[in-house]
Amino acid sequence: RSNFILLKSIIMTTTVVVGGSFAGMTAALEIKRKGKDEHKVILIDKSPLFLFIPSLIWIPFKRREMKDISFKKEGILKEKGVDFVHAEALSVDTETQIVKTDKGDFKYDNLVVATGPKVNFDVAPGVAEFSHYVGTPNGAMKLRAALEEFKKNPGPIVIGATQNAGCMGAAYEFLFNVEKWLREQNIRKKVDLYWVTPEDYLGHFGIDGMPMGETMLKSFMKMFNIHYRTQVGIQEVTKDSVILSTGEVL
């Protein structure tokens, strides 16, 4: 009597994910979870740390430190069977299906590009030179230092978004964080606080609003004495003023 053993041949599919923030990490972990042993997943990112970007708005006020909102991504990826490559992706050859990095080349069957947005600081003259951006670790720390200097000689503050911005939620959060911080520093009465936004109305958020959003925000603006301008862009930023698309100078 003969015994036959059938060996299943596993054809490994390789997916390379470029970028290791929310989209990249989620894609890599989900593809591996669903593909199991038949799917090799490689995540390539130039940073070894995962940064919880939404919490950057707390950094300028010392309510969080960078170590509180970041962790090494390799450990969690390795635990789930995803290979992590700490490298910078330089180019993609779609003909040969190869991602070229500063640490070597990586062949793929499937490719996920999740490198995130690039902020356009050239959207208006002076934005790069005279404004602050809280959306990066370096920017958040520079803003912390700027606020410390601001306390010595307080004056008007303009917070908001430029034309073509698409996600306003964090900016509103930051606005109210600043207002609270000013009160905590006992300098609120010395500061005219402005909110400028390309939104059609307060609380649009880039998603066509939410129930009662406009009503609540109008109430908050009045309650906290925050001046606001909607449906405006930034024409220019100078050392001591913001020129709106309407011509108004703040």
Predicted ranges, named:
Residues 13-83, 163-207:
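Beta1-alpha1 glycine-rich phosphate/pyrophosphate-binding loop at the start
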Residues 40, 79-91, 99, 179-250:
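A Rossmann-like FAD-binding core segment of flavoenzymes
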Residues 1-11:
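Short, Lys/Arg-enriched N-terminal segments with co-localized hydrophobic residues
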